[in-house]
């Protein structure tokens, strides 16, 4: 069974899956051929369990279809193809923590020459330990506090500046936003896995996944989760050396250390923390000296059992200008996508924020805002603050009419960006059909289903009435549009393909 066949099938699967699913679960897999057997390596137990439950069946189908009809012999293992000798797999704490949320059954081993797969537990491997890790340097005679220059403007709002005395003259300053906790983080389908992973790391330090890498667009909650982990670690151990910073702060500290001839003190500082939380790691791109120093710091921390949490606006392997050895190491732990919140989660976020602000927000008002502000949580909260301020200054209760007044410029922009014409064009491109097909009388499934999806999106994303939507879809009756919307809502619950299609199109149209 050739590696080339596997790669061919993976490329076919790439076309079937949303990019974030493919990047999170399939791309980290490594493969090597051992005689007639394919050995597929997952970076950790959690990825192994998820791939086995969700994707292995389809992969085997593709291998059979493109392997001259022969059932492939395949083993799914934990580890790396570069590992010389498999070792026993560690426990899977996150799988247990997230089992209720994800309904994923833990798999102790996987092997197959048919769809049902099971591998001897002894054959399951884990990544080899870090080799050739740079030793901790002794501090220089000059005292160097990397975080001393961080001003209040550089720290998050309401952040707590907190110092912990360590060996010698070094001090660790942690700028953690105390308002970012697990308790006030609104969980939904879009962030369920990320939240479970972050909680596992926070509640079981040194026994969770290391590093934890969260990626996704701006304003989706990555930084909130990172601060929540730090706050929980300090709650459990007030003397813990937890350092949060933006990647640019790390670069600035290194430059300062070089200028002061205090690079050894810099190394000692960052390699003696209990947890290092770095935001927006993509800013390391094309900064070779910074990447070199972070590479050795990262190795030293993992070798010492200290926790590392990183965030980025994209999947780590897609960060251009980042060294391959760093990308590889980021995959040693767990990499999780944080996606834009779905409608129900957006409503829940608004209701929770209103409750925290002690403001009466009617559910229909929250629903109205959530329907129109879809890109990220930050914009959602900003819109709510404008509405609350408008309500306060005008001395009026929050109603849909007041929301229209306070957000009129934002709503006008949204209406301009999301039109029925744009929806039709986007849906036609997605399903590889013509716009004229959507407007035609054709009833074949390949055309009717995309047409129903486009109608449902038009109802959700625009302010047009059902008759108006029907009119721009070839003069159809409003009852046809209503049926299409109900049908798509039903299919979103029962058909995973339609659910993913709708989510992808919604993301494309609103970001």
From Swiss-Prot:
CDD domains: AAA, Bac_DnaA_C. GO terms for biological process: DNA replication initiation; regulation of DNA replication. Gene3D superfamilies: 1.10.1750.10, 1.10.8.60, 3.30.300.180, P-loop containing nucleotide triphosphate hydrolases. It comes from the Bacteria. Residues 133-162 are annotated as: Disordered. The keyword Lipid biosynthesis does not apply. Domain I is involved in oligomerization and binding regulators, domain II is flexibile and of varying length in different bacteria, domain III forms the AAA+ region, while domain IV binds dsDNA. Oligomerizes as a right-handed, spiral filament on DNA at oriC. This is Chromosomal replication initiator protein DnaA. It comes from Pseudomonas savastanoi pv. phaseolicola (strain 1448A / Race 6).
């Amino acid at each position: 069974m050739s590696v080339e066949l596997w790669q061919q099938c993976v490329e076919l699967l790439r076309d079937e899956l949303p990019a974030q699913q493919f990047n999170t679960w399939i791309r980290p897999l490594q493969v090597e051929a051992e005689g007639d057997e394919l050995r597929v390596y997952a970076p950790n137990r959690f990825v192994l369990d998820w791939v086995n439950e969700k994707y292995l069946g389809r992969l085997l189908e593709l291998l059979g279809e493109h392997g001259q009809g022969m059932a492939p012999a395949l083993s799914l293992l934990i580890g790396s193809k570069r590992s010389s000798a498999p070792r026993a797999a560690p426990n899977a704490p996150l799988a247990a923590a997230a089992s209720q949320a994800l309904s994923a059954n833990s798999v102790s081993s996987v092997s197959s020459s048919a769809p049902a797969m099971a591998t001897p537990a002894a054959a399951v491997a884990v990544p080899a330990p870090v080799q050739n890790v740079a030793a901790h340097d002794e501090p220089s005679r000059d005292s160097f506090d990397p975080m001393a220059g961080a001003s209040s403007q550089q720290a998050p709002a309401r952040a707590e500046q907190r110092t912990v005395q360590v060996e010698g003259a070094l001090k660790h300053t942690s700028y953690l936003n105390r308002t970012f906790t697990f308790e006030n983080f609104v969980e939904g389908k879009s962030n369920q896995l990320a939240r479970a992973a972050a909680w596992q790391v926070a509640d079981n330090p040194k026994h969770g996944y290391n590093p934890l890498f969260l990626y996704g667009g701006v304003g989706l909650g990555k930084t909130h989760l990172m601060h929540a982990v730090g706050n929980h670690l300090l709650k459990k151990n007030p003397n813990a050396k937890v350092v949060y910073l933006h990647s640019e702060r790390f670069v600035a500290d290194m430059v300062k250390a070089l200028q002061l001839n205090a690079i050894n003190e810099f190394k000692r500082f960052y390699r003696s923390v209990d947890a290092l939380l770095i935001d927006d790691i993509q800013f390391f791109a094309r900064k070779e000296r910074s990447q070199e120093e972070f590479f050795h710091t990262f190795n030293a921390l993992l070798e010492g059992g200290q926790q590392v949490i990183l965030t980025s606006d994209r999947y780590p392997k897609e960060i251009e200008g980042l060294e391959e050895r760093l990308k590889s190491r980021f995959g040693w732990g767990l990499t999780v996508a944080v996606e834009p919140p779905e409608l129900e989660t957006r409503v829940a976020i608004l209701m929770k924020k209103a409750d925290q602000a002690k403001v009466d927000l009617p559910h229909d008002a929250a629903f109205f805002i959530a329907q129109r502000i879809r890109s990220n949580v930050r914009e959602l909260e900003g819109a709510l603050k404008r509405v609350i301020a408008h309500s306060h200054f005008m001395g009026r209760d929050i109603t849909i009419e007041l929301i229209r007044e306070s957000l009129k410029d934002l709503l006008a922009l949204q209406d301009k960006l999301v039109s029925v014409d744009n929806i039709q064009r986007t849906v036609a491109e997605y399903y590889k059909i013509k716009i004229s097909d959507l407007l035609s009388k054709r009833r074949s499934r390949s055309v009717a289903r995309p047409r129903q999806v486009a109608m449902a999106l038009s109802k959700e994303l625009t302010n047009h009435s059902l008759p108006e939507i029907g009119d721009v879809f070839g003069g159809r009756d409003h009852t046809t549009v209503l049926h299409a919307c109900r049908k798509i809502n039903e299919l979103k619950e029962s058909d995973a393909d339609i659910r993913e299609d709708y989510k992808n199109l919604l993301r494309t149209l609103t970001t």
